[in-house]
Amino acid sequence: MTFSEIILTLQTYWHEQGCIIVQPYDMPAGAGTYHQATFLRSLGDKPWNVAYVAPSRRPTDGRYGENPNRLGSYYQFQVIMKPSPKNIQELYLKSLERLGLDINKHDIRFVEDNWESPTLGAWGLGWEVWLDGMEVTQFTYFQQVGGIPCELVSAEVTYGIERLAMYLQDKNNVYDIVWDERDGKIVTYGDVHKQSEYEFSKYNFEIADTAILFKHFEDYGKECKAILEHGLALPAYDYCMLAAHTFNVLDARGAISVTQRQDFILKIRELAKGCALAYKESLQK
């Protein structure tokens, strides 16, 4: 099963389970949780079932395209079901079967691993899912988002698509993953992404102008707060996301000290909380 087919299979399966399929959000983000369809839609008492591919950027994890299993940008497949179905774990296991895995012939373990995002003011009870010793999925039951307790507990299922693909295709190097294949011609993950891994690593670790980025961070925060004064949660949240990504680039660049780090995280959390509160208020209008 190619990388593309894994995505198509998961989209089809979760659509059959009642999820709408939305598209990736057009802002850099460190994880699928940052998407408005998760962060904001987890709030309120309205049921919400959604699935989508989440391109994710973590600048500090870049390795110039030289590490066989570590990437500065990668893909998650995100599922949110609110409220959480009682059989969510069963639904997940059936999704693995849809991908061609015989779950009776593999060691599948749910390892307790409660999740927290300090920048988003979010946390939940959770488990890592290990497939024959390799983590492939994170399960989380959201308890709080943007510092606000969740009225309905959402189940978040986050697949690591590259890890699943490496397992399903029996590859030891992420760049050898078969992205697509037709008429005997193979396109690999490396064909699609290796150059970008090198160039973004070069930028994030060596070239990024820290003075400009520090100013961007402050400007994004100011704009977010200014928008929130008008009660507009969604455009404000865009600037919260930009501030978070800018922080991540500064962190990769080595420009943020240990003592500064907590201050930056608290600033982003304040923005995220403001967006969450504004969104929650909009639901009551």
UniProtKB/Swiss-Prot annotation:
<dbReference type="GO" id="GO:0005524">
    <property type="term" value="F:ATP binding"/>
</dbReference>
<keyword id="KW-0436">Ligase</keyword>
<dbReference type="Pfam" id="PF02091">
    <property type="entry name" value="tRNA-synt_2e"/>
</dbReference>
<dbReference type="GO" id="GO:0005829">
    <property type="term" value="C:cytosol"/>
</dbReference>
<dbReference type="InterPro" id="IPR045864">
    <property type="entry name" value="aa-tRNA-synth_II/BPL/LPL"/>
</dbReference>
<keyword id="KW-0030">Aminoacyl-tRNA synthetase</keyword>
<dbReference type="InterPro" id="IPR006194">
    <property type="entry name" value="Gly-tRNA-synth_heterodimer"/>
</dbReference>
<keyword id="KW-0963">Cytoplasm</keyword>
<protein>
    <recommendedName>
        <fullName>Glycine--tRNA ligase alpha subunit</fullName>
        <ecNumber>6.1.1.14</ecNumber>
    </recommendedName>
</protein>
<dbReference type="InterPro" id="IPR002310">
    <property type="entry name" value="Gly-tRNA_ligase_asu"/>
</dbReference>
<dbReference type="GO" id="GO:0004820">
    <property type="term" value="F:glycine-tRNA ligase activity"/>
</dbReference>
<comment type="subunit">
    <text>Tetramer of two alpha and two beta subunits.</text>
</comment>
<keyword id="KW-0067">ATP-binding</keyword>
<dbReference type="GO" id="GO:0006426">
    <property type="term" value="P:glycyl-tRNA aminoacylation"/>
</dbReference>
<keyword id="KW-0648">Protein biosynthesis</keyword>
<keyword id="KW-0547">Nucleotide-binding</keyword>
<comment type="similarity">
    <text>Belongs to the class-II aminoacyl-tRNA synthetase family.</text>
</comment>
